[in-house]
A protein has these predicted regions:
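A short, solvent-exposed, low-complexity linear motif enriched for acidic/polar residues
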Residues: 7-157
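N-terminal Sec-pathway targeting helices
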Residues: 1-7
Length: 157
């Protein structure tokens, strides 16, 4: 009986520790709806204020940039403060008139500062991060296009 109580108490302690040491982060993307832009993101990472990168996702997800936020990924991470988001963009497609064209993204990596003091993740709660992309499309000649968006991120809850 005493052993059972000790085991239950230990398990409760582990659950409480995990609950208050980790929080959930949801990353949303939003863009300029003046033309259709689809990006495929193969990796999403957050940089911790205390140093080091936390991987949120390594699976490919395609989202359309619209004026309403689209969920890109959700993950459980250690509570703390985060200052930068990094997204690996494996492909981008833009609709220009009736034609879909592939656009390159310089370096394939978007390094996005988290403005207004960064992202604060508290144990046992959910923090939402919104990535705002102002797509800047440049014709590089011969039917080739480059997408070099102006991007920021901010905590919305």
């Amino acid at each position: 009986m005493v052993i059972a109580i000790v085991i239950v108490a230990a398990l409760a302690g582990v659950v409480l520790y995990y609950h208050y040491s980790y929080g959930t982060v949801e990353v949303y993307v939003q863009g300029d709806p003046s033309f259709a832009v689809y990006i495929t993101v193969s990796s999403v990472m957050l940089h911790s204020e205390s140093g080091g990168w936390i991987t949120l996702s390594n699976s490919s997800t395609t989202v359309q940039l619209t004026n309403s936020p689209q969920l890109l990924t959700s993950s459980t991470i250690p509570a703390g403060n985060y200052t930068e988001l990094r997204m690996v963009v494996s492909s981008a497609e833009v609709t220009i008139g009736p034609v879909n064209v592939t656009a390159s993204v310089p370096s394939g990596i978007l390094k996005i500062p988290i403005i207004k003091g960064g992202l604060h993740v508290t144990g046992g709660s959910t923090a939402k991060l919104e990535v705002l992309m102002g797509p800047h499309l440049v014709s590089t000649g011969n039917g080739q296009y480059m997408l070099s968006p102006v991007v920021t991120a901010e905590q919305i809850s």
